[in-house]
Each structure stands twice: as C-alpha cells, then as structure tokens.
Regions:
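Charged, low-complexity intrinsically disordered terminal segments
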Residues: 32-517
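Residue-level detector of transmembrane insertion/anchoring sites
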Residues: 3, 18-20, 202, 422
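N-terminal secretory signal peptides that target proteins for export/translocation
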Residues: 1-12
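Bacterial N-terminal signal peptides
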Residues: 16-27
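Non-Sec secretion/translocation targeting segments of pathogen effectors
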Residues: 1, 29-32
Length: 517
C-alpha cells in the first residue's frame, strides 16, 4: 500500500521514526511504499515434514525460545542441527579466510539452490559484491560444463534490502549494480538449456530490510550482521574513515535451514525483481532493466527437504513490520536468564528522545525505555550479571552512552550496580550477538536500537543455538575483546547523587511524570 507524504510523517512522528523517514522523503513518492496489511509469513514448506519429529526441549533457555518459534502451530525444525562455524570479518590472523571468501566457497559448491539476502551491496571489481559475483560465475561454469551433475538445475536468488537510494526513483541502484557485475562476468539470468535460473530482487518497502542470511541447498543456513560493503575490508581508497569493521555470522546445518528458507521466501514475496532483456550488455543494465513483480516462489525438490545433521537445537528468528517473532524470542530468552547475559551489541541505545539522557536522565525513566533495555534492567533486578560491549563513534556515540547511563542508573536504584558493566570497543564493531547463562548464543542483524523493534521496525533475522561449541567460541571471542579490545564506559557525574537501593524491584523504579501525571 502506498501512502502520502503527510500521512507518512504523521505515522513516523508517532512511532519515533522521524529520523529514518527523512531518508525516505529524499526519494521519489513511488519509493516510499509502506508495509501495511502484509499478513503473517507462511511457515516452512518442507517436503518430508512427517519425518521430522522434535520433542519439546527441557532446557529452560531452549524452551523460552521454542515457545515463541512454534506458537500458532508453526512447524518445529529446531532439533537435529549442527554448528559449522562463525563467519567473521575482517580477515585477521585468527580468521585468515574472511566471511566473504567463505560464502563464495559455499556458493561454488552448491548442488541445487543458493539463497542470499543482504541489506547493502558494494559492486565493482575488488569489492565484496564482486567476490560473490565471481563465485556465481564459477558456479554457472560448473553447471554449464556438466549439467548432469545438477539434475534439478540450479536456482540462484540474490536479494537486497531496498536501502535508501538518492540516485534513482525506483531505489534500484544497488540491485542493478549487482546485475551489471554478473553480466560483466558473462553470467546470464536464464539458461534453460542447462537448468540455470538467476534472480536478483529488491525488498519493496520502507522501512527497508536489514536481513543478512544465506541458505545453500535448503540445508546450510548462515544468519549474519554484515553487509557486502567495503567497510569490512582493510583501509583503502573506497572505505575512507570506516574500515576493518568487525562482524560475524552464525552457520548451522540441519532442519533449521528450512526456517531460513521460509524467512527468505517471506522477503521474496514482498520484493521487486529485476527484469532485463536476455542479451543485455553490462553498460545497458541501468537503462534497459526494470523492477517488477517477483516470480512465483519455487524451490528445487531437493532443497525442500529437512535433513538431520547433528543433535543441536537451533532456532531461526525473523521479524518485519507486522511480524514480531524475533522481538518476542529475544525478550523471552533474556527473560529466562538466571546468571549472566553477555551482549556484543554495536548499538545499545534508548528511544530517540533519550539519546542525550547522559546529560540529564530525569525524563528517561524505566517506563520510557524500549523493551530490550527494560529486559536488561529486569534481568539485573533478578540478580543476573550483564556485560555489554558497544561502540562510541558516529551516530551511536551519544545514544550508546545514554543507554549505558540509564541502565547503570536503574541498576544502582535497584541496589545492584555491581551487576552491570559496559565497555567501549577500541575497534570498529558492527556485531549483534548475545550469550545467556553460558548455554545459548544468538547472532544476526538485530540491533538494540529502536529501528529494529516494534510495529514499524526493519525486517531482521537472527539465529540462536545451544550448541556447546558455538557457545564456547563466542564466549572466547567476547572474553578476548573484553580483556584486550575495550575500555570502560565511564560513570556519569550525576551518578554520585543517585541513592543505591531505592527500588526493590523494577516495578518500583521511578516512572515518567508525563505518562503518569
């Protein structure tokens, strides 16, 4: 549904999205399509669902997330999974093969289907998007050389997030740049002779999609926080001040990958697809290609099977406007914590009106906090230790400082300030990961930022698992950064005037005079 500019402003003022909306107003009217009345996402359509039998989990953390992901009778694909690896950026001595090269290797080895979604995309030789384009070229060459090895053909679906675009009225600059790279490398969109089908899509709504995930053959799922952008590369002439940006993706195999397919399909259903003449040359892409309705959703038969690969529990979480599953799962997991929460969150911020609360916190009381910060305060109130790693540069500087200040304030009011610790990383970080009680880890695209939550928040994805190796590896990474790559967030001067223990529980914390006259 489309909406007028005045109505957009009204909605955005009410929801606290005015900053985001300003970007949309710079575009043409036809690019400001709102995601209204989309309906619920469809569940995974798994061809062998009758053979997938997951018993309800007994671990309280698993159970907290499971109750959300299976609500409403949605299929349970949480059992029989296996942790593969974390895909990390940037390249380093501990990660000599970076996530971009790992993903390229996965694409080259695909047997029937590649699904990949990213918000932002930097195309052109030597850039992360080019790494993917080269892998798709190599995959096409393999299919072309030996079609018999791919009896169900090869389907490649690449989806971008409709990131705000000031160059074209249809916001198609990034997907068309991706198509241009593919055509430069000689990759066709269709080659029926060998069963090759390549689609490039762009999410159609504002707010945009922030989802970063890829699924290979319906069996191998990675959910990540990084875009295919130069900021994750070493310093070069393109990335200027922001470079070597740290981030990660969590890779699992097993039935949970089918939930990843369902999340991708939900975005596909709400996207536009690039349409080009069959013989379009690279230099013609911008003028000759257009965006239209997407093809009907189909998958190779082999990519619709849920295949058991291990014994781990894993939970695919997804959200977009009108769908709050990932919100509820995050809150349920945090609400089940009993001992410790470790947050590696680039953003840890309150609502926009409280971004400068570090100067004066009086109007930013417990009841004005966004739900994710309230969940953190509630955990502290239960006696849970909370540690947070965040950044202190760019637009997040004041917001994160205020988020830490407000949580510390309320922890002191609860008489439990010692349970909250916050540190700034000494490097550029884009990570969105958390660990709970040393038994479950979650990673993905979802920031502790108002834009990622609520009825008009971005489309997001996350993956959670209780696999011991996954939990231990993230714990080791967190502890290393905590000890060697961070510095304390200082207490604000006014904290000396805050009495300790003035509230017995979060329910006893002060509330806003404006909302409670």
């Amino acid at each position: 549904m489309r909406a007028s500019i005045p109505s957009l402003l009204f909605r955005c003022k009410r929801s606290g999205r005015l900053t985001l909306m300003a970007l949309a107003l710079l575009g043409q009217a036809r690019a400001t399509e709102l995601p209204l009345f989309l309906g619920a996402p469809l569940p995974a359509v798994t061809s062998n669902m009758a053979h997938v039998a997951c018993l309800p989990p007994t671990d309280p953390l698993e159970l907290a997330v499971w109750r959300v992901t299976t609500a409403g009778g949605r299929p349970d694909l949480s059992c029989g999974n296996a942790f593969v690896e974390y895909q990390r950026l940037p390249r380093s001595s501990s990660a000599p093969v970076d996530a971009f090269d790992q993903i390229a290797a996965q694409i080259r080895e695909a047997k029937s289907e590649v699904l990949l979604a990213s918000m932002e995309w930097h195309a052109g030789e030597g850039r992360p998007g080019w790494t993917v384009a080269l892998a798709v070229r190599d995959l096409y060459a393999r299919v072309q050389a030996n079609p018999a090895a791919y009896p169900q053909g090869m389907s490649v679906r690449l989806m971008l997030g409709n990131f705000p675009d000031l160059q074209r009225a249809d916001w198609a600059t990034l997907p068309l740049a991706l198509v241009r790279d593919l055509r430069t490398l000689g990759v066709p969109l269709q080659d029926a002779g060998v069963g090759w089908s390549l689609s490039v899509l762009n999410y159609r709504y504002f707010p945009h999609s922030h989802v970063k995930l890829h699924v290979i053959d319906g069996r191998d799922l990675t959910v990540a926080g990084f875009n295919f952008t130069d900021t994750h590369l070493p310093l070069n002439e393109r990335n200027g001040g922001l470079h070597d940006l740290h981030d990660l993706g969590l890779r699992m195999t097993g039935p949970v990958a089918q939930d990843g397919v369902a999340a991708f399909d939900d975005l596909w259903r709400h996207s536009r697809q690039v349409r080009c003449p069959g013989d379009v040359r690279p230099e013609q892409v911008g003028a000759a290609c257009t965006l239209g309705d997407p093809d009907r959703i189909t998958h190779p038969a082999a990519a619709t099977e849920a295949v058991t690969t291990g014994t781990a529990r894993a939970f695919m979480l997804h959200r977009r406007p009108g769908v709050d599953q990932a919100d509820r799962a995050h809150l349920s997991l945090l609400g089940a914590a009993t001992t410790q929460i470790d947050l590696m969150q680039a953003t840890f911020s309150p609502l926009l009106t409280c971004w400068y609360a570090y100067l004066n916190p009086d109007e930013c009381t417990y009841d004005t906090l966004p739900v994710y910060l309230r969940a953190v305060v509630d955990a502290i109130g239960r006696g849970v230790r909370v540690r947070v790693l965040m950044v202190d540069y760019g637009i997040d500087t004041a917001a994160n400082r205020s988020g830490a200040a407000l949580v510390r304030l309320m922890a002191r009011q609860l008489g439990k300030e010692e349970l909250f610790e916050a540190r700034y990383t000494t490097f550029a970080m884009h990570t969105k990961a958390l660990a709970v009680d040393g038994r479950m880890v979650l990673a993905g695209s979802m920031n502790f930022h108002f834009s990622a939550w609520g009825s008009l928040g971005l489309a997001e994805a996350a993956l959670a698992t209780s696999d011991l190796a996954a939990v231990q590896q993230q714990k080791a990474s967190f502890e290393d950064v905590w000890a060697n790559g961070s510095r304390p967030v200082p207490r604000e001067w006014w904290m000396r005037n805050v009495a300790s223990g003035s509230a017995a529980t979060p329910a006893d914390l002060p509330v806003s005079r404006l909302s409670h006259p």
